[in-house]
Amino acid sequence: MAQTFDVVVIGAGPAGYISAIRAAQLGLATACIEEWRNPAGEPKLGGTCLNVGCIPSKALLESSEQYEHALTGLGDHGVTVTGAKMDVAKMLARKEAVVAKMTRGIETLFRKNKITWLKGHGKLAGRAGTGWRIEIGHAGAAEVVEAKAVVIATGSKARHLPGVPVDNEIVCDNVGALAFPEVPKRLGVIGAGVIGLELGSVWRRLGAQVTVLEALPTFLAAADESISREAWKIFTKKQGLDIRLAANIGRVEASKKGVKLDYQLDGKAERLECDRLVVSVGRVPNTDGLGA
């Protein structure tokens, strides 16, 4: 007989795990389904934000800022730093430690509030009386639970461009761009939104030559004009990003040697050659395989 809960939450990102904790605090028998696994294959809570989004990106931003400050920010104090080196492996290990500490915190809250953590891909499998049947699949096996109510908190995933295959080694979305094993000499970024600017800033501070291609003719078009204008100064003059607006992306050719990207700018055919390419053109709902 299937396990029965008052509430089942599909997704353990910021919306999902908080919903599950609150439901449990209100006395409801609660389960939370999460399919995320880290590169070692270990199941983890926290969703995109905690594992491959907000938290690790801020950890890398802090590390890269410290490195840049050591090189260029101490002159007014009479301090000159020479021979400074960035240990990328150690920086990435620190990032993973920050993430691990926070995921353990969520696990502790789940145990404290007696929330059942179901590991796998959750999908609706039809009605069960006035409630729902939910199927949890993992590694070819599946189990079914029932719930009086279901909270869908499956978040979003990176939008990919047609004809631009992402392997998260040479051509990357946020997942791959947070885990480069070394600083690329030349980094291309498609998209000058928050994600593209953050990731571009990280690797630029560490020494990469970063070129950002943005389809819109206006920088940060959704922001207030004064904010956009100041941000442009910060990212181009202070951070050193080469941002090219109104760039129409064409053919992208990737190999182990790098990427060749053809695009149109001001009516002229241009080509960008880089060692790695980050595709950051927004997010789409993560609703594949959610069921009826």
For every predicted segment, state its role.
Residues 2-15, 183-193:
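Beta1/beta-strand and adjacent pyrophosphate-binding region of the FAD-binding site
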Residues 11-16, 155, 191-196, 207, ...:
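Conserved phosphate-binding and hydrolysis motifs of nucleotide-dependent enzymes
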Residues 147-149, 153-159, 274-287:
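Glycine-/small-residue-rich beta->alpha transition segments that form the dinucleotide
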Residues 7-32, 196-205:
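N-terminal Rossmann-like FAD-binding beta1-loop-alpha1 element of flavoenzymes
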Residues 18, 160-162, 167, 198, ...:
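Glycine/Thr-rich phosphate-binding loops of Rossmann-like dinucleotide-binding domains
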Residues 2-5, 21-28, 32-183, 211, ...:
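Glycine-rich flavin
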Residues 167-185, 276-292:
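FAD-site-proximal beta/loop scaffold in flavoenzymes
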Residues 195-216, 233:
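Active-site substrate-recognition segment that forms the wall
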